[in-house]
Amino acid sequence: MIYGASSAVGSYALQLAVKSNIHPIITVAGRASSHVEKFIDRSKGDTIIDYRNGDEAVVKGLKEALNGAKLMHAFDAVSEKGSVENIAQVLDSQGAVTFVLPGKEYKGFPESVNLTCTNVGDVHNSLKDFGYVHSRSLTRGLEEGWFKAQPQEVVPGGLEGVAKGLSNLKDGTVSAVKYIFKVEDTPGAGQ
């Protein structure tokens, strides 16, 4: 299960799961569900649960998607705003969950659950060799087309567009997109 599958990290985790032929994949997403839909294979049981319907509906949707099976693995690309609690309600007591926000205490899980936290900073220390191999694999994925970056959008006005971009992110008017600000498009830049 991938919670936050339309986020950048969630989308990348989803693509790696698909490439590894892991199915069924239960995803949780919202307004950007159409982005997630591009990667999943419903014929293999993959599905999307819409978090905008509320926590109770998410938990119910997860249980329905499991159809009596145990949820043994979860990747929480959100790690806040109810995702932790929702996962705790459906994850098997012998399961494992990985979070992406370090330094938090994740409560509500039995001691038998394997709780881990991962982030890209891990490859700068003891996992340098893994980071090198992994980045090469993702580069190959981009070249071969099985791995795709988040959609990008150039915000007009260069650095003058940063406030508008941040406002859009804060207000939730944009999702599943990465903003690009071209410094050279900033009025007065280079003069």
Describe the role of every protein-language-model region.
Residues M1-Q191:
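Terminal helix/beta-alpha structural elements that buttress the NAD(P)+-binding lobe
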